[in-house]
Regions:
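Charge-rich, intrinsically disordered N-terminal extensions
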Residues: 1-161
Length: 161
C-alpha cells in the first residue's frame, strides 16, 4: 500500500476541462482509498485559478508521505519528528530515496523543500496540540527586498539539506 496522485477531470460549460489532483492510498489489489491530504497542498500563486491543480507539488508531498509511512513506519503524521523530516530532505537531495534513479538539481530540491514545508505547515497548524512536531520547529521566516523593492518573506529550513 502506498500513496499516489489521482487526477480527476471535470468538464465545465463550453468544453472547459478542469483537472483536480487528490492524494490517495493505492492498495496492493488496486483499490483506491481517498485521503484529505490534498487540502494541505497549496498553490504557489496567491490568486488561485479554478483550473489550478497544484502541479508538481503533489508529487513532492506523495514522495514525502511514502517515505514517512513506508520507511519510518508511522501510523499518523501526528507522530512525525524533526529528525524524520530532516532525513527525508537529506535522502531526497542526495537522490538516495527508495526508487530514486536520477540526480537532482539544487532548484528541484528547493521546490520539494518548499512544497513539503508548506504542506506540513498547513497540516500541523490544523493539528496543533495533537501533533508532536510544531510548524515553528521546521523553519524560520526571513524577510528581504527584491530588485523591484517588494518585501518578500521566505521560509528557511532550520536544518541543513
Amino acid at each position: 500500500m502506498r500513496f499516489v496522485v489521482y487526477k480527476h477531470s471535470l468538464v465545465l460549460g463550453d468544453n472547459n476541462i478542469v483537472t483536480k489532483q487528490f492524494i490517495v492510498l493505492k492498495h496492493d489489489d488496486g483499490n483506491l482509498q481517498f485521503t484529505d491530504f490534498h487540502r494541505y497542498v497549496k498553490s504557489t500563486s496567491r490568486i488561485k485559478s479554478i483550473s489550478d491543480d497544484g502541479n508538481k507539488r503533489f508529487s513532492y508531498v506523495v514522495k514525502f508521505l511514502n517515505f514517512i509511512f513506508g520507511t519510518s513506519g508511522l501510523k499518523s503524521i501526528d507522530q512525525l519528528t524533526l529528525e524524520m523530516v530532516r532525513e527525508f530532505f537529506t535522502l531526497y537531495g542526495l537522490s538516495q530515496l527508495p526508487g530514486d534513479r536520477e540526480k537532482r538539481k539544487k532548484s528541484t530540491v528547493e521546490k520539494c523543500v518548499n512544497a513539503v514545508l508548506d504542506f506540513l505547515t498547513l497540516y500541523l497548524s490544523e493539528r496543533e496540540g495533537k501533533a508532536k512536531l510544531k510548524a515553528e520547529e521546521l523553519y524560520s521566516t526571513t524577510t528581504f527586498t527584491n530588485s523591484r523593492g517588494r518585501v518578500i518573506k521566505r521560509k528557511e529550513p532550520n536544518f541543513e539539506i
